[in-house]
């Protein structure tokens, strides 16, 4: 089955960039969805990164993985407000984007650039995040760190199977990771890796 395997997923900056592209093309969506996303774009963007907040995913029961399509649909149907519905649509957009990453982009890059096999999926995830630009990583930090998403987090806590951490703990870890990605030293180190790379994005 075609799945949204998180092992080969996009990073937060890429998910935000894709989310912004959707928000810029709302005329393509059904009117009811368009109206909700127009009113709650921030909630949609939070949903578009939220699927990666849960850690230790391998410990959840079979079929309750946070990157499972049925889980995404359950989050959407469990939404009790238009704000949470926007979060649910963002969550599903995340899974759709990861499906492309897992089944098209990353396998192609690994096939074409066999010398990056050791670095694998994480390398290309960070390459794409660097490619979309610091502006989208800054926006990801703004969306996740600077706003109160307790209502959405409560929905995730209710729907998602517990890993070894509560969702609130997962969110604190994820916020730290996003801050780290924006750290000047990390960007300098990965920038040097890119400067020495023979491989370009298509």
Model-identified regions with their sequence ranges:
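N-terminal leader/auxiliary helical segments
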Residues: 1-90, 96-202
């Amino acid at each position: 089955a075609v799945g949204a395997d998180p092992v080969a997923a996009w990073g937060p900056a890429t998910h935000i960039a894709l989310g912004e592209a959707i928000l810029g093309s709302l005329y393509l969506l059904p009117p009811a969805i368009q109206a909700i996303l127009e009113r709650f774009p921030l909630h949609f963007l939070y949903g578009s990164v939220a699927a990666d907040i849960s850690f230790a995913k391998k410990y959840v029961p079979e079929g309750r993985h946070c990157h499972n399509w049925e889980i995404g649909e359950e989050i959407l149907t469990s939404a009790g407000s238009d704000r949470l519905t926007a979060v649910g649509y963002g969550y599903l957009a995340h899974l759709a984007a990861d499906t492309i990453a897992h089944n098209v982009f990353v396998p192609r890059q690994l096939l074409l650039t066999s010398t990056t096999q050791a670095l694998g999926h994480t390398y290309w995830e960070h390459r794409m995040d660097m490619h979309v630009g610091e502006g989208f990583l800054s926006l990801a930090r703004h969306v996740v760190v600077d706003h109160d998403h307790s209502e959405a987090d409560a929905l995730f806590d209710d729907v998602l199977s517990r890993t070894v951490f509560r969702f609130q703990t997962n969110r604190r870890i994820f916020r730290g990771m996003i801050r780290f990605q924006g750290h000047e030293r990390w960007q300098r180190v990965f920038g040097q890796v890119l400067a020495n790379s023979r491989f370009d994005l298509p």
